[in-house]
Amino acid sequence: MVMKRIAVMLVLCLYSPVSAFTIATGPNDGSYFQIAQDIKNVAAKEGLDVQVTSTKGSLENIHLLGTGKVDSAIVQLDALRFVSDVLKQQRGLDLFDAIKIVLNLYPEEIHVLSNRKDIQSFYQLEGKRVSVGTEGGGTAITAAVLFTVYDIKAIASFDAFEDAVKNMEQGNLDAVLFVGGAPVPFIGKLDNRFHFVRLPANAILDEIYLRTKLGGPQYGWAQSDTETYAVPSAIMGLDKKDENYASQMQALVLSILNSADDLRANGHQKWKSSIIQSYFPNRGYEPTNQLIQLFNILDSRGYKIVKK
């Protein structure tokens, strides 16, 4: 089908972004940073200047966003409520209702790794030493959810992934958790001395996460596929009543939607499982929700939105 082009007079057509648009991500060797670099590249083709900021994780991302130091942030959806509560308690910032989902991105797999043959299921982590990533990061938040739901009392430690793997090799740790879009480059560098630990199906987790598998398709060293869950991630922004901010958000989202095929072909592998055309009616940012709905309607009829 030949894609037809249509110019639509939206807010984004009335207000032109005049300054760089900042997005908080995560460590510069993680999936968020790579995804944001892809976004930066496609946005540049539309004349949008996106600056990618590396961070320690979700706690820092939401704090930077809530205090206005960045325009947007990539965050795991299960982290928003948890981190908002922490920031309200520790720093007096009430951010939950002020932060909205600008664009859904993709599900991030929960990687649980061990080099011990007697640890095959998450239930076998009872009383074990488990690294849950850096303090305040999305992995630590997801780990807290898993330990609570599975009712597992483990000895948790906060470590960078490389340090955690070294400690596990030296016998000082029994397992390592990491949440990230597979394939994660540094996990891909491991070998078959390690294996993935299964996350058993759970009705509560089924309401929060997406059921999936990790194995050979993502990591060549994996000897079998292992059941796990994935955490949806999204670009989040502030619920500002500011027309220029709304214009920037809409322009950014439109550049991503219009570049979906290019991103799937040439960007990070997670774009192949992206959920960018979905939206949350209540938690979503209204200006971009409206744009996504319009995009979906026109896309289903073979039209494409272009800026005028």
Where are these regions (language model features)?
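Pocket-lining segment of extracytoplasmic ligand-binding domains
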Residues: 77, 88, 152-245
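Bilobed "Venus flytrap"/periplasmic-binding protein-like clamshell domains
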Residues: 21-44, 51, 108-166, 170
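Ligand-binding clefts/hinges and TM-proximal coupling segments of bilobed small-molecule sensing domains
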Residues: 129, 133-146, 211-281
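Sec-dependent N-terminal signal peptides
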Residues: 5-18
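Extracytoplasmic small-molecule ligand-binding "clamshell" domains
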Residues: 23-24, 29-76, 223
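A structural signal for short loop-to-beta-strand junctions that line the ligand-binding cleft
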Residues: 92-105, 218-226
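An extracytoplasmic/periplasmic, membrane-proximal ligand-sensing/linker region
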Residues: 163-172, 176, 180-191, 196-198, ...
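Pocket-flanking alpha-helical
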Residues: 53-92, 165-167, 182-190
